[in-house]
């Protein structure tokens, strides 16, 4: 089955690569229209997925992530229309010039070819990824979570209808709808057809992909994010940032999970933190140095376990650790961070500069929330993932990250001397 999908995707990628920006936008507009026109089919499929998930004991938070409503589906369709408004990077000349030989050389952006994406049970990801791949002239093979298999199948069928109505092959967007996990291992070895693989899931999936994939893998999305509270910080302003970074959307990968507090400000900062976290419903996981003082406050407090410094809670839980100084904070981030997003809150710009230079994460912030690590917030439009590695993309992956480049030389029957 996957072999045939790979063949179809590779053939479709050749046709997609030849489309103009106007033609690609016409396809995206048709997809958005069809998502709305066939919304009942998608919503009915989603209702079955949610019912099964509820019967299997999934939490209310997870059920909310799975569920589609008419308003959410319209929002997804509108997001596709927003992709139409983004600048198309394909065909852009990055640099070039005329060589001494007379050869005119340029470096031009081109599609990658076929993208494979393995992702969690979020129905919006199916459309988001498909629209970004089509905008950049790439075919895509999707493998979504089993909890949304009906929703994904219905959504991809709608997308394929739109593709065919525009004269394009259905193989441009395909989904593996069989939940058998053995197919993931098979997909990881499809280097004959898939040019880049993006896993969006937990640490186990990322480890599996790194160890078994014969395809170049872009890993990321696991966010053990830190905020270091420096001794020179303005406490009231710092608390606003921390509340935003922890509570705005706790289930996202750019949410802060560990707060590192300079020991010289702990006595004045911790009581204020406890009050604010109590109001926000956050449970604090405190180290020995912070535990007694936080237990005297109104927030719920438990003793931190050593392994929790490596946890991505994705919930209203926050580690709190007292550190000696900036060096201690940086050392902790180097040991426990995932190179996603880390921040310093300080009035000392020398410390800020050191933090920026020495913390090796894809996004580093000074006096700002980690929640900004997002394609839309960065002005990239939608994102296909957040990469925490260094090749070939880093941070939020917008349209440019779904392209590569080729060298084009134009001569006048020019030969090398």
UniProtKB/Swiss-Prot annotation:
Cross-referenced InterPro entries: Ald_DH/histidinol_DH, Ald_DH_C, Ald_DH_N, Aldehyde_DH_dom, G-glutamylP_reductase_CS, Glu-5-SA_DH, GPR_dom
Domain of life according to the entry: Bacteria
Alphabetical UniProt keywords: Amino-acid biosynthesis, Cytoplasm, NADP, Oxidoreductase, Proline biosynthesis
This enzyme's EC code(s): 1.2.1.41
Pfam families in UniProt: Aldedh
GO MF annotation terms: glutamate-5-semialdehyde dehydrogenase activity; NADP binding
Organism whose genome encodes this protein: Shigella boydii serotype 18 (strain CDC 3083-94 / BS512)
GO-annotated biological processes: L-proline biosynthetic process
Similarity-based family: Belongs to the gamma-glutamyl phosphate reductase family.
Recorded GO CC terms: cytoplasm
Family annotation (NCBIfam families): PRK00197.1, proA
Role: Catalyzes the NADPH-dependent reduction of L-glutamate 5-phosphate into L-glutamate 5-semialdehyde and phosphate. The product spontaneously undergoes cyclization to form 1-pyrroline-5-carboxylate.
Principal location: cytoplasm
Protein name: Gamma-glutamyl phosphate reductase
Locations listed in the record: Cytoplasm
Catalytic activity, as annotated: L-glutamate 5-semialdehyde + phosphate + NADP(+) = L-glutamyl 5-phosphate + NADPH + H(+)
Pathway recorded for this protein: Amino-acid biosynthesis; L-proline biosynthesis; L-glutamate 5-semialdehyde from L-glutamate: step 2/2
